[in-house]
């Protein structure tokens, strides 16, 4: 056992005190005022601390029946923070088609729970079909059938029937994001658009095309409308 001289004890205490003062001090950012619950959950040092920020059992329930926002992500449902997942539940009206879109931070697992849904998905540029053209993957889904849209792939869903279709989508991120291809493409400058389309859209027509792009979440399919005797309108 080592023996420490009494004369060295004050020096040792001073040294330890200076080390303690120099050591990083924990600041509880998880309770910082003005931050959203999601932001505080992100700042929590451990998963255990995140649970303390969600003290009620109701914090772990997201009710798709009552919410106006059919997508659960870490903003709308903070309990998802750190899980790496999100979900959406939705209804596609008769003859409805979602905009061609992509999710920049997640793959989507899409399951039909009622009705019928046709899907089209375009993977990355170098994925070609047997003829050397861009491959387009098309599916015809019934109840309890699923497809996958890889992260960043262009895709759309169409209800070709006269009754609503319902589906559930799971995402591999708690912040999947969405990009709508047509409206974002035509947000570029006129010169870029004209050159991108090889001059097939004249400069004077670009604003007309921009204005024609629907702004709602889904659009109607003309052929289906005629079959079902429905009136065309954005939905």
Regions found by a protein language model. Name each.
Residues 82-84, 109, 124-151:
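Short acidic-glycine-tyrosine-enriched beta hairpin
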Residues 94, 103-129:
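Glycine- and acidic-residue-biased ligand/ion/polar-headgroup-sensing regions
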Residues 94, 140-162, 171-172:
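Conserved metal-binding segment of the jelly-roll/cupin
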Residues 1-25:
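Fungal secretory targeting signals
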Residues 98-103, 158-159:
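Short histidine-centered beta-strand/loop micro-motifs
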Residues 88, 98-100, 108, 137:
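Short, conserved secondary-structure segments in the cores of folded domains
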Residues 17-89, 99, 213-235:
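A short, N-terminal "cap"/entry segment at the start of jelly-roll beta-barrel domains
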Residues 29-32, 130-137, 158-235:
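Double-stranded beta-helix
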